[in-house]
Structures are given as structure tokens and as C-alpha cells.
Amino acid sequence: VPFSLNRRQLLGSIGILAGSTLLESSSSEAFASALGATLLPKSKWLQHENSRAGSTEWLSHKGASIGALDGYASTTSVNRGESLNLFVSTTYASFIVKVFRMGYYQGLGARLIETSSKVTGHVQTIPSPDQLGTVDCNWESSLQLSIGHHYPPGQYLALLVAPDQTGRFVPFLVRDDSSKAAFVYMSSVTTWQAYNAWGGFSLYRGANQDGDDGFNDATRADVVSFNRPYSRSMQNGAGDFLGNEFPFLFLAEQLGLDMTYWTSLDLHERGNLLSSHKALLSLGHDEYYSPAMRDAVTTAVSNGLNVSFFGANFIYRKIRFEPSANGHCRLMVNYRSTADPIMATNPQLATVNWQDYPSGIASSTFTGSYWGGVDGAGSLEVENASTWLWANTGLSNGAVLPNALGGEFNHYVTTAVNPANVEILASSNVGGGESDVTYVAAANGGGVFCSGTGHWIYDLSNFPKLYALQQGYMLAPPIANVTFPIRRATVNVLSLFGSGPAGASQPSTSTPN
């Protein structure tokens, strides 16, 4: 489920913010030193980039009213040297665009890259959903961005700003396809789009808006389009970035990691490039996978790539992509059953859940981690505190991190198809059963780390310079006695995974049942 933070949760954390010792050091270097992060593969260009003047202006605009200002990008990611179009519909006579690169930047979270001149605004037609629930806009381009050298690789938010200073985000990512960086940061845009109900339909919600808070509506869409904005309810158009991904990006850029940037669509289209890297970093909610995406990951792991799943419910829904009038891979298909018309001609592409017929391949087959459910709230209970994951956290066996777990959860299931030597590093009781932190790595092989909770990224949140500035409640607060040890454990994963096949130095040891 996409990250959300309500007012009650935020107000309940004010005391933590006021008195917490978890808040970051005044400098990136001091924080990195405190975490003992000197063994991390680092990038001089990224360290230099984050030393540049940051800006909090990205947080200074209230969200525009629904239907007043909306936009989307021509692609989820763009390689340096290419261009990207923004398609905007607005009731305002004009607007401007401010483009921010997201990162650490002295704790301010972003750097302003450029500001457009005034753009003439006009209302563009919202198409009616077709018989599959697809809302596929065919808008005219409002502005083209030339992605030159002034656009370093990274995650971007374009902020559409109206004359009354309200705004709406349009996310996109800048790649460097020549990169040989140790880490691939991957933004889970396929999952963002699955939950995006702009235009009235998503892969969960439809005309009836029934079911569990609108989820699993019988009239939901079977095909959704990337040619549409993200809804206002998705963090003012930012998709699922600010809640389920930004806390990790903020930390990673603070540490100056040797990192390149992909979306999940890039895994589909250029997954062969994983061989140039040491680790793939999957973030808070990475649920929707095409066969090409899954094959790229499993092949790379068998060849020594490390993969971290810092969320839960990963590789669960099987999808395929189709072209639209506006480009290839702009439509995402997910029937969730054998009613998928492709069953008649190519059943292996039928968009069932991955573990169901005719696919029959659960995520546990190479991870040892199986989806458990949506009621994953609870406290994390540490096992095997002497292992590498918990080093320098100050935690001992049986230590409890209160309220560290939430959202969906994964666990180790003995009756599932699992790889050998699945090691359980924490096992915790949650509302829906048991949540497990797992690790698996064959001798000299690639390692796979699974946090087992949808809140691992949430637990990294630590934005002391930003909370008072945010419009609404988009940024999660730190959690007392949780944020530091989870940050430390995350750095331990990065330290191990950034050095090559994790099994060469840290093969997993099967945890007794």
C-alpha cells in the first residue's frame, strides 16, 4: 500500500522530534563517521553534488485544487543528453515549472536545477475510461526539458507553480546508462502507477469504489497508463516517492554512495546492464514485475549481483507492457487472473499473481521471503544480534524496536519453495502473523536481503530541517530508539553488498526451524 501519514501520527511524534537524540549530525561527514561508513563505496561526483546549495522551496507550495493543475512526463526516466516533455492541463492562464533534483543537500532535501519562463496554460481533455478502465491521456506538450550536463543523474521532481503559488509535482528520473556504479537505486514506478487512481481508475479502484476502502473493486482497471498525472492524494502528484523512497535517497546521498539511478521500467528495458553493477536496491514497495524484470534480477543474482528488498510484498503481481499512441511501455497490464486474453496464445505472459497458475513462481524461490499480508504492524524483535546486520547497532538478542514494523509484511515459510540456507535475522509477531528479516547467499554468490516489512524505509526518516516547512503531512518523523539502529543496519547491508558477491565473505547459514 502506498505510504501515507495522517495528522494523528504526525502529532503523536512531535515529542520525538522535540527531544530525540536521533536527529542527524550537522554535517554529512560527521554522520557517516558516526555510522562507521568508511567502507562504503562512495562517489566523488555525488559528494560534490550534495555539497552544493540546497533549497527548501520544493516544500513551500500548497497543493493545487483537484483539476486545477495537473501534469505528467513523457517518460519515467531519461538518459543524460536526451529530452523530456511535460504535458500539463490547468485552469490557470499560465504557470511556471521549477525543477528540483532530490537528495541530501545539507538536510534541505533538494537543489533547484532550473526555473522555466512563463508557460501559457489551458485545459486539456480528460479521456473517458475505455472498456478496460484505461485512462490514457493524449495531451499536447506544454514544455520540453533538455537534459544536459546541468542535470546530474538522480531523482527529480518538477514542480508546476500557478500564479497563486499553489503547485503540483511531476516526478521523473535522470539516468546515466554508461555508469559502472556499485549500486543501482531503483524507483518502483510500476507500483506507483498501479495505485494511481487519477481519472477514476487504478488497478485497485474503479467505478464502484467498493471493497476494502475502495481496494479490489470489481470494476477496477485491467490496464493503466503512464500517460496521465499522479493523483493529488499521491503526495501532491509525486507518486509514492516521498514516503516509500525519499528517506532512503536522503540517507544514500548524505553518505555519498557510488550510485546510479533507475526506475522499475529500466529494469524491464535494460536489465542486462545489471552486470555492470554490484547491487540492486529495491525500496519501499516493489510489487509489480514483468517477466523481463524478474528474469533480469534472478539471472543477475546467479551471476553474483546482490539485491536488497527494503520493503515487503515484492515481485507479487505479474504484469506486461504494451505501447500506446505516445510511446512504448506506456500501458501496464494486470488482469490478476486467467481471464487475461493472452492465455489463449501465450499463457506464460498471463498477468496472474506470480505464485499462481500458470506462472507458479513465488518471490520466495530466490529470496526465501514470502508475502504474509497487509496487517504488518508491530515491534521488531532481534534475533542473531551477533550477525553482520546488527553490528554496531548496540542491539542484543531479544532486543525490541517498538513500532518499527508496519504496512505489508513478508516472512519465511517452510512449506514454500526456498533457496538453501535461508538465515533469519529477526522474527517478529505482527497483526497478521509473523514478519521475518531474511538473508540468503550461497558461497561466493550474490546475496539477497529482505527487510520483511513495508516500514523499513519509513524507519529511516529523519528530516529535522523540513518538518516545519512541509505543506500537509508528507514526511514521516523519526521513531525513538528505532531510526538510528535501522539506519545503522541499512548501512551494514550497503557495506556488504557494495563490495561484490556477498556470499564470498558472508555466506548465509540456515536458521533452524
Give the role of each language-model region.
Residues 3, 24-58:
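C-terminal segment of N-terminal export signals and the immediately downstream linker at the start
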Residues 9-31:
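N-terminal export signals
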Residues 82-86:
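Structural beta-strand segments of beta-rich domains
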Residues 90-95, 99-103, 110-117, 164-274, ...:
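Aromatic-Pro/Gly-enriched surface loop or interdomain linker
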Residues 95, 135-179:
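Extended acidic/polar, glycine-enriched regions
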Residues 124-137, 143-146, 150-152, 237-323, ...:
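Helical hinge/lid and interdomain linker segments adjacent to catalytic or ligand-binding clefts
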Residues 315-432:
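An acidic, glycine-rich "communication" segment
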